[in-house]
Amino acid sequence: MNFWTLLLPPIAGTVIGYFTNDIAINMLFRPYKAIYIGDRRLPFTPGLIPANQDRLARNISRIIMGSLLTPEEIQKLAQKLLQTERIEAAIRWLLQLAFAQIQGEQEQKTAGILAAILRDLASESLPRLIKVWSREDTFLEAQVYQIFDQLLLDFKLTEAQARQLTDWLLRTVLTPDILRQATIDFLTDKNIEIIDTSLREKTSGTYWVVANLFGVKNSLTRLRAFCLEEREIANARLQELILTLEIRLKLRLWLQGLSLQNLPVSTVRQLRKSFHQTIRQYFQNKGAGLMEYIGESVDWDNLSVVILRRLQASQVLDSSLGVVSQELSLLLDRYLEKDLEKIISQVIPILAIDQVIIERVNNTSPRELERAIQGIVKNELQAIVNLGGVLGFLVGVAQSVILLLN
């Protein structure tokens, strides 16, 4: 028997078995489009997969959603993705990105928004809130008491302050001319009569003798006349009395020793309570107007820029980003731990993954599908191709043996 007759079946079987997969794939996809002769379409055109690409897409989508991307698997993927460390890193990144935007081109826009918020808060919201809050008896109670206890109760004038205040009082309030005029205003006929009668009736001993024998009416009347008629001389006498009696020194020492701590405890408590009531009534009556005036007078635009730039340079802000990110991530983790399954069930219909798969397969051309499948076969299923060649070779050997035996 001819040697080539025995050798040809194994060779042919090997070639056919090795290239059968490529031929089968080509037969599934080609021709890519229908071929027409006249108005009649040739049978088996286009290929099996191009002709049924929509059905293939739906089957692929059903298989993936039913076996691979089940709600349970998506939930597991979400749990891996939404680990606390990853959430914290994402939140921190978002916060840093937000502050980077503030520091960049968005600074003026952010400052404008902040200025509008502060202006509305000071001019509109805060006045209404103060009007409501001030109706309560405890409005600013702790704050006012703290100011009273730590500031007013311990307040005392220093020696320099007492000296300055004394100089001002003697130069402006207690001048000789003002004292002379006050004496004239006080020594009216009625007041002189009252003083004279009181001294006659309520004194005793030597004072009674003086009051009843001599009286003070004439003396006080002459004093008033002296102050009226001898203005310059009266002022000079009063100035001499101020110097002789050391009024300046005594007034300075009195001011220097003036303190609320020298008052009785009951009086201090009453003053403390009255101070709070005065502050509360002021805010109740005029607090809204005060806040509106502040809201209109403050340059909120410049203030907002200053606040933002201060925040940008603040180390506290940088250190607090980590704490804020951690707290928000823990809060979100607790929420997701409880409601993740419910969220996934709501998200899947919204994402419409099955429709995405169908559209992606339908939008992929038959040529691209063929290349993808051939790439999978060559890269991942090469053993099947090799097995086809081996089986073809074995079949060819079997045929050669049969021919040899015959």
Swiss-Prot record:
Keywords: Cell inner membrane, Cell membrane, Membrane, Transmembrane, Transmembrane helix
A family per Pfam: DUF445
Regions that span the bilayer: 384-404
Superkingdom of this protein's organism: Bacteria
Membrane topology summary: Single-pass membrane protein
GO CC entries: plasma membrane
Protein's cellular compartments: Cell inner membrane
InterPro entries for the chain: DUF445, UCP032178
Secretion signal span: none
Sequence similarity: Belongs to the UPF0754 family.
PANTHER family assigned: UPF0754 MEMBRANE PROTEIN YHEB (PTHR35791:SF1)
Protein name per Swiss-Prot or TrEMBL: UPF0754 membrane protein SYNPCC7002_A1087
